[in-house]
Amino acid sequence: MNDFSRSISDLTPERVTTAFDLAGHTTARSLGVAQGIVVRSRSIVGSFGAALQTIFGGNITLYTSLCEKARQQAFDKMLADARKLGANAIVAMRYDSTEIGSGITEVICYGTAVQVTRNAGA
């Protein structure tokens, strides 16, 4: 069964995997790399609040929240990029981050955009 005609609407977070194939599906076509990049900076207020949290130790919730938001935004941008390529799944998804300046961090989410078909009986 060929379900490429619905490829754009079928790409959901459930069809993204860090594995090299999507369980219950066969990769019919590789479309290239899909990526989403976000560059975030800390505010002065946020940096001050985080500095206060370090005095007491433990999880620095202000930075945790900032990182979670950046990862989600990068993931969403990767999905949008894959949809433009006509993908209905993403395999080999990864995150990476780099500090590109004082208080400025780049977060990238990338993977291989693919078209998959459901295996018989899956």
From Swiss-Prot:
Tree of life domain: Bacteria
A Pfam match: YbjQ_1
SUPFAM superfamilies listed in its UniProt record: YbjQ-like
Annotated family: Belongs to the UPF0145 family.
Protein name: UPF0145 protein BamMC406_5002
Organism: Burkholderia ambifaria (strain MC40-6)
Lineage: Bacteria, Pseudomonadati, Pseudomonadota, Betaproteobacteria, Burkholderiales
